[in-house]
Amino acid sequence: MRIRNNKLINFILEFSQIMLVFLGVYSALMCTASSLDMIYDGKLCLLLLFAASIVFYGLFTVLETFRKGKLYGLIGITMFFLALVIRFKGALLKGIVSAANSFLKEFMNYTGTNVSLLSYADTESASAKFCTTLLLILIGVYFVALISAFFYRRRRSVVFLAGTIPFVVLPLVAGRIGRYLYFFTYLVVAVTIIGTRHLRTDATDRRMRQKLALILMTTCLICGGIFYLFIPPSRYDRNVDKLSQAKNSLVALSTWDGEVIMTWLKAYF
């Protein structure tokens, strides 16, 4: 019975590490995709990124046992992805243009500026939804592979942060914040990974890191539950919308001249 319990505990600890990689990349990617109202298949992205997290966990835990195994593994994966980019360059180009235009529309709405949308000779028969989904999947799976290579035995939290933070921050440029679920999930994962970054050696420290990560993740989820009671999604969305309203008000005020300001002061004071 004790052996079975140990196996179960080991499975939970190892699986929690896979979930950290998966949820970290997926939530960061969805912060951009959902907040900018991109057209994509969310369920397919979730399924393939989760499958990729499991595959790369198995791959890199094996490659780590060989000299320069991770390096050769990353080179092989990069070459494979380059081949996919060449093979589906038409669909990917359409996906890039669609994603970029989604960002530009939100940016223009937020800043009140006029920017020309991207255009190109569309020879791709696939739908914009398929092309954007393909783009998100390739980006997500590649970052899952990259982060997995520096995560399980000797963790490099800087790789995770460098690969995911841009997707969380990008919507802010257009006055948007990732949707409630994705933004909160990313914060939980980021805090958990940063909190265990100093434990990098093998064996005992690795097991301690896994246990500490599980404790931190549980603590963050409890705090998130409390946060949910005080700031439910509806209130969160209202406050996010106020960012654009406040910014637009400031822009309007900056265009007032002295005469307009004096007229406004006389009217209200």
Question: Which residues does each predicted region cover?
Answer:
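Helix-boundary/low-complexity linker signature
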Residues: 1-269
